[in-house]
Amino acid sequence: MVRLRTGAVNTMSKRLILSVDPGKASGICLFEYEKGYEPKLIWSGEYQQNEYAQPIRNAFVSYVQYGMPIDIVCERFTINAQTVRNSQAPYSLEQIGILKQIMLDHKIDPDTIIFQSPADAKAMFSNEKLKKLGFWHKGGEGHALDAIRHAVLRLAKIGWIPTKLLD
């Protein structure tokens, strides 16, 4: 089970950010954010197809348990000439479908998923910047880092200023 930090929770100002980089191997992470404070990376990981749904379900358990608003961010998957040739192409679409079903199971409209382009996330938050921010995931093939990238891009879009990058 995903556990958030202990203590009283002010559900009016705190929110969760669940971020997914879907694919054959998927990156998933969960952040907690309160305006005026640094975001906290609760967990991150890389998951194979048979493992993919459980961490998402766990994040939704935390969402229900703590009553915090949740933003669900997902890398946009666009079918183009390259992805048609790529044998892994259907995996991303299938994983997005699983994410949408889990949202429906928790009475969350899947149309509220915030899709972001991989190029935007990588342009804004390089590996060097993720390290400087302290949001580095060790191990894996980089999918967890891509999920983290999408989460911090979302955080920046809702008002978080990554001041550690200004030093």
Specify the residue positions occupied by each region the protein language model found.
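Phosphate- and other anionic-substrate recognition elements at nucleic-acid/protein interfaces
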Residues: 2-167
